[in-house]
């Protein structure tokens, strides 16, 4: 019972964190777009957020396996509170260069916080899920997280237009402080601690399957973020004349829908019961995903419209959600119970590498060649992700 209670506490803290994470992204994007930042400037604001994700997942996975997941969770929440407080001190009178550098540093802290909290909850699920229910639990956690992140996007747009940038940051810091105090009171035990001593070398010695899967993850997430991070919100705002509410609202609906689909994937793929069937599903849905951005790019070149773009992105979201849920299940399925924090950390490090590449490409490709070009780049990245799922086997083999 304590294991399940611990897991519930970890998940609740992660949910609260996710709300602020989504809201913060919209706040920063819309607030600094309003102050006149270019698409490339905006991409740079999120750059260190993603870079820190790479480092944090790697080191955090090792710390979690060595000292337990309580430490990583509490640290994550505390760091986010500090990041929100510091960001509120940004002064519009500063020069562009100073503003970008300062916001990047605050976002770096927020990136550390996000990945410590995320890794804690993703690894905790292996300790409490009964045999045969793992896919359902992983998908439910991932799906609910994305749905809440979407609510956060909407919340960010709403807070910005009601209580302003600074008020929004302080209200979120206050909520997280309450959550941190509650988590300190409820979490006991050494959830996620490895039984054997964890060495530094364990960070990189993975099985072949985990290496292939992590490589696929890099390109899968880059394929989403190359249009999602800067391209689409700025396109809707500048080309389609949407206001903050509409952009925040659409991005929110997209991510909430994406999260709901993810949570339903185990029901859609009842045949996926182990790593072998999971690998087969990853190849099938990866092949399907490849066709979508390419088809959408052709459509947008022939007759560009907001309706086509939105319809295409919604379909992409559904198929992408299935891919992501299957990949998230496979990483836990290929892991040993006491090494799961290490493997999840390594795998989400790959996730962060993909998001970093996608974020950078999103600003650069959109500014140089427009939205259609970001869709073509997305199609190429999905093709690479698909290639890396081809060697996945029925169980993890040593590298």
Residue ranges of each PLM-predicted region?
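Hydrophobic core of transmembrane alpha-helices in multi-pass small-molecule transporters
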Residues: 15, 83, 96-116, 307-322
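Central cavity-lining transmembrane alpha-helices of secondary-active solute carriers
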Residues: 44-62, 252-265
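Conserved MFS/SLC helix-loop-helix module at the cytosolic interface between two early adjacent transmembrane helices
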Residues: 55-92
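Helix-to-loop junctions at the C-terminal end of transmembrane segments
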Residues: 56-69, 160, 261-279, 366
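C-terminal ends and interior cores of transmembrane alpha-helices
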Residues: 78-96, 287-303
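Cytoplasmic helix-loop-helix junction between adjacent transmembrane helices
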Residues: 106-145
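C-terminal transmembrane helical hairpin of 12-TM major facilitator-type secondary transporters
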Residues: 279-327
């Amino acid at each position: 019972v304590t294991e399940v209670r611990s897991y519930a506490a970890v998940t609740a803290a992660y949910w609260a964190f996710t709300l602020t994470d989504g809201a913060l992204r919209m706040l920063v994007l819309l607030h600094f777009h309003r102050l006149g930042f270019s698409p490339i400037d905006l991409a740079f604001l999120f750059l260190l957020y993603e870079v820190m994700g790479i480092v944090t997942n790697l080191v955090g996975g090792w710390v979690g396996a060595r000292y337990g997941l309580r430490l990583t969770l509490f640290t994550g929440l505390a760091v986010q509170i500090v990041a929100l407080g510091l960001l509120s001190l940004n002064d519009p009178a500063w020069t562009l260069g100073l503003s970008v550098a300062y916001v990047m540093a605050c976002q770096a802290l927020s990136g550390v916080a996000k990945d410590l909290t995320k890794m804690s909850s993703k690894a905790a699920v292996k300790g409490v899920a009964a045999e045969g229910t793992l896919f359902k639990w992983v998908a439910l956690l991932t799906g609910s997280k994305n749905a809440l992140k979407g609510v956060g996007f909407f919340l960010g747009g709403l807070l910005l237009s009601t209580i302003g940038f600074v008020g929004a940051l302080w209200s979120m810091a206050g909520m997280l402080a309450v959550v941190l105090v509650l988590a300190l009171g409820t979490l006991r035990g050494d959830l996620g601690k490895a039984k054997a001593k964890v060495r530094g070398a364990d960070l990189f010695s993975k099985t072949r399957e985990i290496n292939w899967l992590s490589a696929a993850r890099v390109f899968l997430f880059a394929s989403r973020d190359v249009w999602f991070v800067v391209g689409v919100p700025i396109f809707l705002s500048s080309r389609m004349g949407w206001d903050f509410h509409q952009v925040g609202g659409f991005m929110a609906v997209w991510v909430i829908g994406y999260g709901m689909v993810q949570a339903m994937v185990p029901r859609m793929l009842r045949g996926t019961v182990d790593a072998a069937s999971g690998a087969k599903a990853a190849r099938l849905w990866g092949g399907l995903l490849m066709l979508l951005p390419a088809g959408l790019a052709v459509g947008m070149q022939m007759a560009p419209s907001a309706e086509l773009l939105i319809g295409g992105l919604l379909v992409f979201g559904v198929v992408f959600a299935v891919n992501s849920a299957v990949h998230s299940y496979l990483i836990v399925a290929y892991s040993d119970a006491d090494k799961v924090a290490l493997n999840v950390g390594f795998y989400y490090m790959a996730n962060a590498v993909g998001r970093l590449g996608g974020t950078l490409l999103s600003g650069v490709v959109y500014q140089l060649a427009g939205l259609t070009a970001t869709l073509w780049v997305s199609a190429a990245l999905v093709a690479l992700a698909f290639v890396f799922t081809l060697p996945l086997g029925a169980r993890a083999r040593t590298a």
